[in-house]
Amino acid sequence: MDPIKEALTYDDVLLTPKYSEILPSETVIKTKLSKNLNLKIPIISSAMDTVTESSMAIAIAKLGGIGVIHRNLDIKRQILEIRKVKSKNLKVGAAVGAGPLEIKRAEALLKEKIDLIVVDTAHGHTKKVAEIVKKIKKLKSKKTTLCAGNISTIDAAKFLSKLGVDAIKVGIGPGSICTTRLVAGIGVPQLSAIMAARKGLGKKKIMLVADGGIKFSGDISKALAAGADAVMIGSLFAGTNESPGKIIKKNGKYFKSFRGMGSVGAMNKGSADRYFQKKQKDPSKYVPEGVEGLVKYKGPIEKIVYQLIGGLKSSMGYLGSKNIKDLRNKPKFVKITKAGFYESMVHSIDEVKK
């Protein structure tokens, strides 16, 4: 057995400030997921059935990012959601799985001239993922960007890069409603996972998407500094006007549903194969790797994205980084203690004014 390594996530570290001549307002946060897919902001909305359908994808695209339409829909309904976005001349992505019938979904989606197709599985370092990636590469045009995941190791990054994907999705278990690390005991803390994937790619011009675990705008800066080209966000966007589902009133407060794609509800709706399980008539036969619950109603997505982008720009100002490439130029992380983490949070105040 190899020595047990230490692995870190966003809350374990801080970026140390550098000499700067750059103001936050002067920073440029555009990025790309391939030669043909440029984004004005490094934000992607997650392919979750309580996060991204056409309303979310339209809103994110208008703000400069891209949304990925989830695959817990029949093919016709997923295409309908895509067309709603494309009818406004906006960029859109769509998710497919690695199951035996998913190539039919991929064929249908690619006919819609989507900008991004995502092979969305819980474990991207597998034979099944390799098989569908190879098939999609033969079908897709050069204008459609191919992303596959999820992974968290050097070897997995090398594996997917050899298949010729444009982008790789990193993250096994960091999401707020994901229980893979508890149920399966599998995963790598997200910051270390991003660094491992970037190391595995070497000098290859393959983009990384950090998927999961973003709680604050500062986490985006840490993810990009560690090697990501964009972040995928779920929980922060759940509960907004644009997320699927109705507003629920409970005890005088307003909520919307939010669930992991590994929850029983989501798996029963169609995402079971994402976790390499079969659809069951009896829900108790699932081994869920996610939970389902409620999140507070948050209003329009635009306000949230504005704060996230503002925080990222502020971070880049502290680091003297004009753009994301500069942000990744020899960043200096410091590992912090539990006391350092608590010091970073709001403290010594009885009530925060909202």
Segments from the language model and where they lie:
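Alpha/beta catalytic cores of nucleotide-metabolism and tRNA/nucleoside-modifying enzymes
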Residues: 1-21, 95, 163, 185-210, ...
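Active-site entrance/lid segments in N-terminal catalytic domains of soluble metabolic enzymes
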Residues: 1-207, 237-240, 343
